[in-house]
Amino acid sequence: MSADSEFDATDYIQHHLTNLRLDLTEGTIDSEATGFWTLHIDTLIMSFGLGALFCYVFWLAARQATPGVPGGLQNFVEAMIEFIDKTVKETFHAKSKVIAPLALTIFCWVFLSNLMDLVPIDMVPSIMMAVGVDYWKILPSVDLNFTFGLSLSVLALIIIYGVMGQGVGGWLKSWVTHPLGPWLAPANLILNIVEFIAKPVSLSLRLFGNLYAAELVFILISLLPWWIQWALGTPWAIFHILVVPLQAFIFMMLTVVYLAMAYEEH
């Protein structure tokens, strides 16, 4: 490959992995903007749009639900709800009307976000460039802001359910008495701080890393001649069909496990 083609390939890869960014301090679109006051417009629109799609599908299923023979959509939604509810009850043993709906929301939202990775790599960016938008990432899971946002929300819930299950005093006490006993309070505190930080970091990086790698492979395959693209892209897409729900399930399952540990820990 020549130097020019290498530059073109690098430019192509960077283009597909760059967000549409709004610099709030300047009020301008800047693809190189970074910092706290920078919004990734494409991630926000795609994630909220997919969340709205999930809500609409379930609302439609509820509206069309009948006591007689259920339709295909109703069957699908009921099967998913029963599966999530059973999974949650096997992990979170306390009574809660929130955990199962929360788990269902996380699974469906992350699943739909991951599913965007199966959309043809150039289709949406080409459409957006045709209407004057230079950058557009359709895959929210390949944005650390999205994955860390989800994991930090889970972290907040861990604190809330820890206090609900143990009380404020019991939750604070567990930081210095668990797991090595009160005589090793400093060591307990250090271990618990590390574990507390590791939970959201591992949740977010696991989801981001798997989907980023998959997206990068799709981009690299798209740089090859068309006849090689089909030979390599098809089996990779088939394999990725398994990865998409698996990563959503892992994120959901770990969330429920962390909440159960926080609520039931003594």
Curated annotation (Swiss-Prot):
UniProt keyword RNA-binding, yes or no: no
One GO MF term attached to the UniProt entry: proton-transporting ATP synthase activity, rotational mechanism
One Pfam entry name: ATP-synt_A
Lipid bilayer topology: Multi-pass membrane protein
Spans traversing the lipid bilayer: 41-61, 98-118, 119-139, 152-172, 178-198, 216-236, 237-257
Keyword Transmembrane helix attributed: yes
Any single biological process term in GO: proton motive force-driven plasma membrane ATP synthesis
Described function: Key component of the proton channel; it plays a direct role in the translocation of protons across the membrane.
Subunit structure: F-type ATPases have 2 components, CF(1) - the catalytic core - and CF(0) - the membrane proton channel. CF(1) has five subunits: alpha(3), beta(3), gamma(1), delta(1), epsilon(1). CF(0) has three main subunits: a(1), b(2) and c(9-12). The alpha and beta chains form an alternating ring which encloses part of the gamma chain. CF(1) is attached to CF(0) by a central stalk formed by the gamma and epsilon chains, while a peripheral stalk is formed by the delta and b chains.
Family statement: Belongs to the ATPase A chain family.
Protein name: ATP synthase subunit a
Species the sequence originates in: Halorhodospira halophila (strain DSM 244 / SL1) (Ectothiorhodospira halophila (strain DSM 244 / SL1))
Lineage: Bacteria, Pseudomonadati, Pseudomonadota, Gammaproteobacteria, Chromatiales
